[in-house]
């Protein structure tokens, strides 16, 4: 019976850490949360090493060999509701108010919390693009142009994600579509500032979370995970820039820009 509870507790801790990483949790916080949960569940000699896309953990139960587990976390998206739910679960365990069975049920609930609807994501991109265009020197006339560019980017991202296309190619195409749209509108309505509209629309694609977490990981002494996140942010930024450049090149070739 002790072996069964030990295995379930260890799997629970690994699932919690994976949930944090999959939904935008910090590497340092994921590792700390796993250690707290393991101690609360009575998992002794627990050692864990967390990377941006992987978890390595081991534990030992007296009377049996050490157990090692590895989890691969290939993709990372942001769902702070799930992160908060796991953090709350960790606090409940530390306070001794939950057992393994109750914690498993709570974790399953946390992992299935619904994401934002596609319509809400599109609305956020539209409003965000228009707002950023105004903040970066645009006028009220530039805001609708940026809003439509943000709409195009959101549609591209959603469709490509649905078909499993990688983030780099997705951002190239999304930035290209937004750029072409803004330049085309400026060609018809010269009063429109295409630069402001493009910059505003691109802001919804920028890898702000990856950049911030990369810096935080490095400051926490986790140089490997921090470097991985910063490289990810750099690749995304480069793909966005590449999409804009392709848009301008095509527009110049057509004599529009």
Protein language model features and the residues they cover:
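Alpha-helical transmembrane segments and immediately membrane-proximal extracytoplasmic
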Residues: 49, 66-81, 95, 109-126, ...
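Soluble N-terminal domains of membrane-associated systems
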Residues: 1-97
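Internal active-site segments that recognize and position negatively charged phosphoryl groups
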Residues: 108-167
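Alpha-helical membrane-inserting segments
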Residues: 131-136, 152-161, 177, 181-189, ...
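Generic detector of multi-pass transmembrane helix bundles and their immediately adjacent loops
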Residues: 186-257
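Cytoplasmic-side transmembrane-helix entry/capping segments in multi-pass membrane proteins
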Residues: 145-148, 166-177, 200, 227-232
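Cytosolic regulatory modules rich in charged/polar residues
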Residues: 28, 98, 102-115, 168-169, ...
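Hydrophobic alpha-helical transmembrane segments
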Residues: 64-75, 85-93, 115-122, 141-150, ...
């Amino acid at each position: 019976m002790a072996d069964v509870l030990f295995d379930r507790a260890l799997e629970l801790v690994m699932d919690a850490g994976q949930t944090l990483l999959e939904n935008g949790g910090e590497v340092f916080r994921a590792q700390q949360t796993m250690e707290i949960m393991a101690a609360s569940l009575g998992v002794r000699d627990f050692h864990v090493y967390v990377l941006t896309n992987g978890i390595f953990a081991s534990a030992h139960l007296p009377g049996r060999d050490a157990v090692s587990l590895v989890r691969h976390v290939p993709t990372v998206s942001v769902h702070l509701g799930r992160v908060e739910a796991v953090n709350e679960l960790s606090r409940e365990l530390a306070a001794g108010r939950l057992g393994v069975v109750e914690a498993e049920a709570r974790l399953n609930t946390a992992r299935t919390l619904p994401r934002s609807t596609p319509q809400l994501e599109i609305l956020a991109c539209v409003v965000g693009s228009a707002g950023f265009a105004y903040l970066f020197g645009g006028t009220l006339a530039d805001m609708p142009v940026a809003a439509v560019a943000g709409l195009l980017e959101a549609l591209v991202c959603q469709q490509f994600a649905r078909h499993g296309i990688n983030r780099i190619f997705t951002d190239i195409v999304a930035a290209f579509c937004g750029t072409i749209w803004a330049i085309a509108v400026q060609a018809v309505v010269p009063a429109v500032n295409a630069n402001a509209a493009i910059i505003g629309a691109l802001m919804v694609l920028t890898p702000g979370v990856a950049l911030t977490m990369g810096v935080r990981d490095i400051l926490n002494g986790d140089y490997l995970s921090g470097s991985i996140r910063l490289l990810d942010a750099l690749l995304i930024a480069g793909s966005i820039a590449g999409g804009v450049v392709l848009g301008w090149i095509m527009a110049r070739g057509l004599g529009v820009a």
